[in-house]
Amino acid sequence: VGGGGAAAPGSVGASGNDSTFSTITSAGGGGGGSEQNNGASGGSGGGGGGHGGSTPGIFSGGSGDTPDVDPNQGNSGGNSTGKPPGETRRAGGGGGALEAGNTDGQNQGGDGAPNTILGPDTTYAGGGAGGGEQTDGPLSGAPFAGGAGGGGASGGSGGNDPGAAGTANTGGGGG
């Protein structure tokens, strides 16, 4: 599984590095888009950045499985929402090995795939969550979850709080 991209507050995430074992190479994950930018393509795609200011719009998640190989390397990142100014602006979740970003809800990273290499019930290569924090309900102010399989949680709103790193040795993407 290729590595996830590094994140920095307020900037576009870097795409991850390729991972090679013998003759098998897995493409690194695409970096997530920052505010008003699309996510990058990669083994698993990065999520689309949220919009801000007076420029509403939807920004695309990066394509997964890039370059296209068999078996599939990962899924696409989710798109950001296009809410008008003053309402919640949410970035897209990163793609995971098993499902695309946003499959389980806006900002949510896609789930990774189960594998029995280290025993049953082990999941790898979850996508990182999109930036922002929950604004309503009992979890108001809490970060969004990364996908099952080590995906990192989101940072806070406003672009000033970095997301969480993916879990070590799982191939999970950072939030």
Task: Report each predicted region and the residues it spans.
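Low-complexity, glycine/proline-biased repetitive segments and flexible coils/loops
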Residues: 1-175
